[in-house]
């Protein structure tokens, strides 16, 4: 791998670690960086997910004392269903050709960018309509969201927070704890599936994982100084630019 390629993917992973520690959205950077350096789209998605796994594990551990299951569910049920969903999403990715995934990616990025842009309003809307005790629909929601996360990491955190709001989790810290737990669980399972399926590009993984961890530590410090609206607007801008680039490549 060329030194320039290492610099590009490590830089992307570092900033992905920062924004994942603050608000999520690291895939907006890691996926295009890997594709730009010549990694096929499916392998790029799998490798980027694997590189960000240490950050998910650290976040889950940091929030371990705030994890509370939604009404009608247990923490064990959330973990098991999340693992099944993550595995299903990862298997679906492995069954997707590079050509098909290249056509899907712009739409996934667009979806994730819109979620980021309207995330606060969506959470407020759902909080006013949230109900408690929907065990069956809670399980369906966890399965669907984790399936999405196993297939494509982008915007996963926003989708999870919205789901937990809808299930009656009004405390944002508790919702974040559940989000971090589910993100870690489904990503561990998804990465295991990617490894068995041979989807990970190993030369790119070590520098990206190290850079993402360093970015996570930096993000924890930056988060105390950077206004959340500035961060969110920046992520939306990056997502919009990335989405346009992928659409131009698809239809250009």
Question: Language-model segments: what does each one mean?
Answer:
Residues 1-40, 127-176, 182-183, 206:
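Selected transmembrane alpha-helices and immediately adjacent juxtamembrane segments
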Residues 5, 39-54, 100-109, 147-155, ...:
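Structural signature of hydrophobic alpha-helical transmembrane segments
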Residues 6, 49, 105-109, 113, ...:
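Residues within membrane-spanning alpha-helices of integral membrane proteins
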Residues 47-100, 187-230, 234:
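Selective hydrophobic functional segments
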Residues 58-67, 107-131, 241-252:
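Transmembrane helix exit motif
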Residues 71-81, 105, 129-135, 176-182, ...:
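Cytoplasmic-side transmembrane-helix entry/capping segments in multi-pass membrane proteins
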Residues 88-89, 144-154, 190-198, 242-252:
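Hydrophobic alpha-helical transmembrane segments in multi-pass integral membrane proteins
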